[in-house]
Amino acid sequence: MSKITLAGTEIEVSGVFPQVGDVVTDFTTVSAKLEDTTLANFAGKRKILNIFPSIDTGICATSVRKFNEQAAKLANTAVLCLSTDLPFAQARFCGAEGLENVFTVSTFRNKDVHKQLGVDIVEGPLAGLTARAVIVLDENNRVLHSELVPEIKQEPNYDAALAVL
């Protein structure tokens, strides 16, 4: 269990958040095409997991835009933007914004992923959604960088995540 804050109010997050050196085991999410998507779909690539509560909030949307911009410059790296949003909402947002360099994936069918990644908000107004986090994986899903953002209304440290690639 971890603690983060939402507008200064402490909330509990369930699961064990991966640390540098840990290996993240594969998990299943849903793509914009409503197809099961796993880390194995990106085998041989480094992966940035941009995890957030909902693409329809300002800070979450900003993180998707910023990682989309950086993804175009990254060789052999897939950026997965992971939230509980329905794939339709994710696709609508990326289509309207012209974002083509990131992969949006939804946990709406498999919320066990939240606990597996240590980002499952279990109390407060956002219970059932994910905490804001960034996890960078190498080609073998070993963690190169991990940040559980301490305040949900705060952006992640993009520079720190990108520096390990």
From Swiss-Prot:
> Per the record's keyword annotation, is Zinc-finger included, yes or no?
no
Catalytic reaction annotation: a hydroperoxide + [thioredoxin]-dithiol = an alcohol + [thioredoxin]-disulfide + H2O
Q: Entry's Gene3D superfamilies?
A: Glutaredoxin
Q: Which residues form the active site?
A: C60 (cysteine sulfenic acid (-soh) intermediate)
Keyword list, A-Z = Antioxidant, Disulfide bond, Oxidoreductase, Peroxidase, Redox-active center
Enzyme nomenclature, EC number: 1.11.1.24
> What InterPro entries does this protein map onto?
Redoxin (IPR013740), Thioredoxin-like_sf (IPR036249), Thioredoxin_domain (IPR013766), TPX (IPR002065), Tpx_CS (IPR018219), Tpx_Peroxidase_subfamily (IPR050455)
Q: Which residues cross the membrane?
A: none
Per the database record, which ranges form the Thioredoxin domain? Answer: 18-165
- Bridged cysteine pairs (disulfide): C60-C94
What is the top EC class of this enzyme, as a single word? oxidoreductase
The answer to whether keyword Zinc-finger applies is no
Q: What does this protein do?
A: Thiol-specific peroxidase that catalyzes the reduction of hydrogen peroxide and organic hydroperoxides to water and alcohols, respectively. Plays a role in cell protection against oxidative stress by detoxifying peroxides.
Record's family? Belongs to the peroxiredoxin family. Tpx subfamily.
Question: What is this protein's name?
Answer: Thiol peroxidase
The source organism is: Pasteurella multocida (strain Pm70)
